């Protein structure tokens, strides 16, 4: 309330955002998103809907205004006979501005689960960290780690509650459970897909081109590492919004290991020299 008063907010908005009494049933915490518990609540102050807010920004009374966020990345994950390979670039952009070249776009949920970031970094980090909390609570309640399928379904259910509210997220959930290696794609609308190979981001089309020419389920670990390197390297070469270093992880039966962090410019130079 004090902050709203300092900012000169209208009195009506101050009342709408007032903190309820302790006895009130309204909550300010995000709650738990377990399958059998109450509906989720996001920890944001009550106020106008995002769509109404964006409409107020329109010029000359323009309606249905939509703020487009420009972002780019290249993330890749694929299953093979020895587990799951996850390879990502590290460039973060704000429009045409390169804000960072050292962002780790792999979120380590627990020793047997990994998540990737594609879209708005804040959305991906928030929801996957919340997923990590719920996976930890599941382990404490049940004495065993959550399955890859259940973890991806939990993330899908969480973001589905906020579809149409301009979230921007395309994540892959990778892990190993009793059924073996698992790989799922989840986006901001709650879409959930299972598959052997996914690539997301502005450089994904280039990564798919390399993957389609060399992917086989029977690859050895070293062959899989090299395929992941080439896919991300050539994607960053053609996509100006991707670059930096390649962070590569290998999900094994006993948990994930980080394989390497390699500069894409060095790899591209090596590949070009080898082709001459």
From Swiss-Prot:
GO terms for molecular function: endopeptidase activity; threonine-type endopeptidase activity. Induction: Up-regulated by interferon gamma (at protein level). Pfam families: Proteasome. The keyword Hydrolase applies. One of its GO terms (biological process) is proteasome-mediated ubiquitin-dependent protein catabolic process. Residues 1-72 form a propeptide. GO terms for cellular component: cytosol; nucleus; proteasome core complex; proteasome core complex, beta-subunit complex; spermatoproteasome complex. It catalyses: Cleavage of peptide bonds with very broad specificity. It is found in: Cytoplasm; Nucleus. The active site is at 73 (nucleophile). Belongs to the peptidase T1B family. The proteasome is a multicatalytic proteinase complex which is characterized by its ability to cleave peptides with Arg, Phe, Tyr, Leu, and Glu adjacent to the leaving group at neutral or slightly basic pH. The proteasome has an ATP-dependent proteolytic activity. This subunit is involved in antigen processing to generate class I binding peptides. May participate in the generation of spliced peptides resulting from the ligation of two separate proteasomal cleavage products that are not contiguous in the parental protein. Required for adipocyte differentiation. The 26S proteasome consists of a 20S proteasome core and two 19S regulatory subunits. The 20S proteasome core is composed of 28 subunits that are arranged in four stacked rings, resulting in a barrel-shaped structure. The two end rings are each formed by seven alpha subunits, and the two central rings are each formed by seven beta subunits. The catalytic chamber with the active sites is on the inside of the barrel. Component of the immunoproteasome, where it displaces the equivalent housekeeping subunit PSMB5. This is Proteasome subunit beta type-8. The lineage of its organism: Eukaryota, Metazoa, Chordata, Craniata, Vertebrata.
